[in-house]
């Protein structure tokens, strides 16, 4: 018969009592009342915060955007097809954040920073909030370094500086994305990290852009954030913030970054869809009242940091699409008022064969020549004024039957200057090449060249300079000034190349 030993039993009970953990885990739960169109209405969730992530039974995650008296309006970050009425939901106590690391370079990710290029997971030990506050006034310094786009028309007349926000605006099919991708390609060897955010675009268009970047060797310093047209509106709305968080990671590591949002019109439309489904009151063009804040809090994250924070920079090039050239619509005027200038692309110029189709009269950079090297200021200072005067002359010349020789010469030079500003896609030019090109055009060296042959002549001149006068490029790169020596070398090269070109044409 087994003998019961009371002292042994009491010691076991005492041990159990000592090991007892009285910690109670409180989970804030709710129930789905209604689900559909990427929106769920939830009863309960009394402790939920605005913008908090909530998790559904099937693992789908949503963001609590509407906190109402009787229910909570949640936008889903997924299709939500398996969520049913009556399913349970719990709060997570977190707001949206993404992993960040150097391993993201060269990769294609979605709005949740998950890889979508089929090249396996991305290792990251750090996290950043998707929506983090912009640097304050004390944390910034004024923009003073140029960010070269490689496009003569922009770098000479509408210069962009590191830490600036410059809007690219125009109708569909006017070359907005081409300007942005050329800028990324031109950052090769400039120690600039690029982030390209594609919002609501066709998958085929995105694939073409990635192919171009790969062929030009630009993917090694670029991250592509993709949410195509068939993505849920929530993810299209989040994608730009994800891109900004990835770019900020590098900015705070004392690096220079460039981010392109292609395009913010589609993000505004996704946000409008979410807001209307959440029954928020519509305003102008049915956009919600806070659509300005949607873009301002995103674009204010672009900055040039002060020396205490490492002088890193985040330059933003948002793209906005207009309808029939109407820049006075709601979203275009909002973004124009937030940014430090705009590059306006005209469909008339594009159709006339002037590419990039930049309307110099309507485009402006509010940073101005502070974002140019001294050599560019010396050479291109009067170019914008000269083009404006020629455009005015052309409008008068339409009504005049006979023009004096001076006017005819000015109009002929205008044609050559326009030809000089034309550039093929994916062929950005180095600063010294741009300076040589502008100097040749503005000082009348193209006046004797046929308009049709200007492009060929300039291409040959740039090659001739590189091969026979490498000192010219060296002077511009090292001194960043258009010295007398550089000018003498350039004039010599122009004269030699003109002689060669004339002989070529005769043969």
From Swiss-Prot:
UniProt-listed Enzyme Commission number(s): 7.1.2.2
Organism field: Welwitschia mirabilis
InterPro entries per record: ATP_synth_asu-like_sf, ATP_synth_asu_C, ATP_synth_asu_C_sf, ATP_synth_F1_a_nt-bd_dom, ATP_synth_F1_asu, ATPase_a/bsu_AS, ATPase_F1/V1/A1_a/bsu_N, ATPase_F1/V1/A1_a/bsu_N_sf
Main function: Produces ATP from ADP in the presence of a proton gradient across the membrane. The alpha chain is a regulatory subunit.
Keyword annotations from UniProtKB, A to Z: ATP synthesis, ATP-binding, CF(1), Chloroplast, Hydrogen ion transport, Ion transport, Membrane, Nucleotide-binding, Plastid, Thylakoid, Translocase, Transport
Protein name as catalogued: ATP synthase subunit alpha, chloroplastic
Membrane topology of this protein: Peripheral membrane protein
Compartments, as annotated in UniProt: Plastid, Chloroplast thylakoid membrane
SUPFAM superfamilies for this protein: C-terminal domain of alpha and beta subunits of F1 ATP synthase, N-terminal domain of alpha and beta subunits of F1 ATP synthase, P-loop containing nucleoside triphosphate hydrolases
Domain of life: Eukaryota
PANTHER family: ATP SYNTHASE SUBUNIT ALPHA, MITOCHONDRIAL (PTHR48082:SF2)
Disulfide bonds: none
Subunit and partners: F-type ATPases have 2 components, CF(1) - the catalytic core - and CF(0) - the membrane proton channel. CF(1) has five subunits: alpha(3), beta(3), gamma(1), delta(1), epsilon(1). CF(0) has four main subunits: a, b, b' and c.
Gene Ontology cellular component list: chloroplast thylakoid membrane; proton-transporting ATP synthase complex
Matching PROSITE patterns: ATPASE_ALPHA_BETA
Binding, ATP: 170-177
Catalytic activity: ATP + H2O + 4 H(+)(in) = ADP + phosphate + 5 H(+)(out)
Family: Belongs to the ATPase alpha/beta chains family.
Site (Required for activity): 363
Molecular function in Gene Ontology: ADP binding; ATP binding; proton-transporting ATP synthase activity, rotational mechanism
Top-tier EC class: translocase
Gene name in the database record: atpA
């Amino acid at each position: 018969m087994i003998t019961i030993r009371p002292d042994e039993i009491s010691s076991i009970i005492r041990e159990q009592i000592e090991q007892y953990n009285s910690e109670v885990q409180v989970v804030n739960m709710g129930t789905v009342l209604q689900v559909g169109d990427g929106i769920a209405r939830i009863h309960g969730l009394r402790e939920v915060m605005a913008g908090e992530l909530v998790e559904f039974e099937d693992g789908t995650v949503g963001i609590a955007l509407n906190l109402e008296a009787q229910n909570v309006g949640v936008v889903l970050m997924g299709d939500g097809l398996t969520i049913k009425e009556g399913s349970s939901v719990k709060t997570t106590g977190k707001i949206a954040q993404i992993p960040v690391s150097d391993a993201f370079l060269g990769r294609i990710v979605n709005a949740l920073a998950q890889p979508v290029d089929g090249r396996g997971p991305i290792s990251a030990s750090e996290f950043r909030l998707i929506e983090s506050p912009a640097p304050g006034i004390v944390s910034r310094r004024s923009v003073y370094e140029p960010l070269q786009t490689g496009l003569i028309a922009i770098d000479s007349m509408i210069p962009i500086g590191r830490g600036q926000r410059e809007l690219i605006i125009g109708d569909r099919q006017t070359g907005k994305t081409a300007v942005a991708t050329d800028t990324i390609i031109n950052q090769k060897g400039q120690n600039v990290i690029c982030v390209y955010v594609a919002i609501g675009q066709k998958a085929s268009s995105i694939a073409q852009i990635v192919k171009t970047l790969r062929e030009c060797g630009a993917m090694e310093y670029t991250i592509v954030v993709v949410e195509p047209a068939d993505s849920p509106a929530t993810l299209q709305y989040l994608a730009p913030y994800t891109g900004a968080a990835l770019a900020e990671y590098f900015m705070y590591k004392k690096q220079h970054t460039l981010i392109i949002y292609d395009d913010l019109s589609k993000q505004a439309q996704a946000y409008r869809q979410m807001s209307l489904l959440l029954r928020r009151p519509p305003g102008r063009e049915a956009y919600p009242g806070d659509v300005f804040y949607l873009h301002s809090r995103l674009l204010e994250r672009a900055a040039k940091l002060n020396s205490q924070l490492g002088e890193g920079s985040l330059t933003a090039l948002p793209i906005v699409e207009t309808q029939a050239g109407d820049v006075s619509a709601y979203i275009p005027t909002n973004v124009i008022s937030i940014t430090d200038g705009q590059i306006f692309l005209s469909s008339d110029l594009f159709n006339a064969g002037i590419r990039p189709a930049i309307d110099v009269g309507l485009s402006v950079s509010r940073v101005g020549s502070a974002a140019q090297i001294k050599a560019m200021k010396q050479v291109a200072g009067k170019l914008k004024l000269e083009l404006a005067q020629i455009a005015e002359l052309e409008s008068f010349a339409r009504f005049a039957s006979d023009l004096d020789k001076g006017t005819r010469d000015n109009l002929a030079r205008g044609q050559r200057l326009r030809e000089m500003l034309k550039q093929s896609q994916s062929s950005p030019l180095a600063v010294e090449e741009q300076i040589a090109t502008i100097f040749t055009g503005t000082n009348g060296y193209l006046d004797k060249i046929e308009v049709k042959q200007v492009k060929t002549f300039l291409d040959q001149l740039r090659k001739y300079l590189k091969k026979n006068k490498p000192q010219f490029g060296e002077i511009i790169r090292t001194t960043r000034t258009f010295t007398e020596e550089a000018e003498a070398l350039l004039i010599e090269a122009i004269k030699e190349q003109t002689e060669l070109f004339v002989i070529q044409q005769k043969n």
